[in-house]
Each structure stands twice: as C-alpha cells, then as structure tokens.
A protein has these predicted regions:
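Bacterial N-terminal signal peptides that target proteins for export
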Residues: 1-10
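Short, flexible, surface-exposed loop segments at domain boundaries
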Residues: 6, 21-23
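Bacterial N-terminal signal peptides
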Residues: 9-18
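Hydrophobic alpha-helix-in-membranes signature
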Residues: 18-20, 45
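N-terminal "mature-domain start" segment
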Residues: 25-58, 158
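Acidic/histidine-enriched, beta-strand-rich ligand/metal-binding domains
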Residues: 29-33, 121, 152
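Conserved polar/disulfide-associated segments of primarily extracytoplasmic proteins
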Residues: 52-149
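Short, low-complexity, Pro/Ser/Thr/Gly-rich segments in the mature regions of secreted, periplasmic
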Residues: 147-160
Length: 161
C-alpha cells in the first residue's frame, strides 16, 4: 500500500471510530423548531441529539433538554428584563464566573463561553421587549469540534417575535 493510500485509510478509520457527532453527517441530524409560547422566543433544537426532556428552568419560561447519555444539556429560556437592562448590564448583574474564554456583547445580545469541570458552557441571550431570550448549552470539552456546528446553528436561530 502506498503512503498516500495508507494516509487515506488512516483518516477514514479515524472518522469512523470517532464518537458522535463526527460520524453523523449534518443531513442526518433531525431538527425541530422549539418555541416558548409565553414569550414568542424560538430556536432550532437538534431533536436527534437532545432526546430527553428535563425539568423546566427556574426563573423564567422555557424548557431543558438532555442527551440520552446525559453528557450534554440545552436550556432554552426567556427571563424577564423588566428594568430594561442592556445586554452588558444584564450580564454584569448575573456575575459571570472569572476566566471567560469568549465574550461578545452588542446592543441586542451577548454571548459568553468558557470551560468548567471538563465541559464547555455556552450562553447566548438576545434582548427583545421585556425579555432576555437565552440558550445555555453544556457539553464535553473533549468533543468541542464535533459540537461546533450544532452550537452555531442553535445560537444563530435564536429569535423572538
């Protein structure tokens, strides 16, 4: 076997042996549009990944979802912002932990992300009317690359009416 064929075979074997979701082509992930009826927030949720419903989030409206193995979770939540705080002020009042790896704050939303206990946590909140509409995702840090596309789609589809 030539070196080129050996490298191709090794690459294929690596992909086939990798844990989800590398083996799952994006077309094989089933998505649903989850809505928070009380507030109008909506987001795309990968229903073939987050297969279990969990307890409702505290302090707002929405839902929580878990993977079957419970190694990852997703919270979709609308939280009252009756004081009309800006995303920057709202985030500051939540006292985010030190060591945030990624932070972006605009007049309409914020995103923060970091590592904790071998997991990545990602939080995006969009501001509309008297609510902050948020997604919070926790997943194994060792699977970051596999989750990147899923997290991006969830984040980019968060909307409110």
């Amino acid at each position: 076997m030539s070196l080129r064929h050996h490298c191709i075979a090794l690459a294929i074997a690596t992909v086939l042996a990798a844990p989800w979701p590398i083996r799952a082509a994006p077309a094989s992930i089933d998505w649903i549009r989850y809505s928070v009826p009380e507030t109008g927030a909506a987001v795309d949720v990968p229903s073939s990944i987050f297969t279990e419903a969990a307890e409702k989030p505290e302090g707002g409206y929405g839902g929580r979802f878990l993977t079957a193995d419970r190694r990852a979770d997703l919270t979709v939540q609308s939280v009252a912002n009756d004081a009309g705080l800006s995303p920057a002020d709202f985030l500051a009042r939540k006292n985010p932990p030190p060591g945030i790896v990624y932070k972006r704050v605009t007049p309409r939303f914020f995103v923060v992300s970091s590592f904790r206990n071998g997991r990545i946590w990602y939080n995006r909140c969009n501001f509309a009317g008297r609510f902050a509409h948020c997604v919070l995702i926790n997943y194994p840090a060792a699977e970051k690359r596999q989750w990147d596309g899923v997290v991006t789609r969830i984040s980019n589809t968060l909307a409110s009416r």
